[in-house]
């Protein structure tokens, strides 16, 4: 029998809906308060949190130790794609970007690289990876995604991403495909302060850009990261993360997606400037998001308190909150998340395995 949302207080329910960043390389008393008082859903490890293998292990172990008194385990997430999208310590050999592996056409090699990535993450106690990127390449070449995309062909992206997702799952890692509904045909994609948008109709997007996302849904994907992308023909005035028409009507109802919807970092300048962090969180929940990423640790407590207040005032439906938090609890249960301490890490062995895979890619 899994964990029940009925056993959580309102504060704890709200806490479960957020994946947050931390400042620096050590979990301090402020982090402990977030864990023990607000029962935060999990943490996102970024490159500014990583110095070395030893330090990263200490950090993750300390986060889990802080959560030892809570019944619900932590998500510990990372965006580890390979290539330049690499967060792991420099002591770990870097795997190539996914595009170059996919170009080999060798699905077995792709699965091997993905399995190894999952194995490395699991060795650190990380249990969620914001990957793979399902956006199509081509239109984003030389831009912010470039070699992070698998292919320009939606059929290839669908097929290869399925291999990646399966490999992560086999290693006990929660895969989080991104960035629904896709950047490929958007404008302003190179700007950090203007929301990327596309004026394509949904019908045209469904023929190309949305194909990999729909395939992942049909294959039963448990999570999906939504990007700050404006579908102008569907909702002119809001990014996908804050659009009821995109999240609820399109993703949940039309595509019958039953998994956990995660909003990309609400601290991103393109939304924070326009809506503010609290306004962004409210809008994301109203749109249908189940979880939200907030990488700026300093802003987390204010958002948690504001969302709790909005529920008490009736501005957010408590029954709907319960349904979403239960999905989060079920996700953690399905992947058997535990706050276990990692006591051993074999750098040499992992690097040898990475070198073997790199040699196969070079052939």
Q: Which residues are covered by each model-predicted region?
A:
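Preference for extracellular/luminal or secreted protein segments
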Residues: 1-38, 254, 273-363
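A charged helix-plus-loop insertion that forms the helical arch/lid used to bind
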Residues: 92-105, 149-151
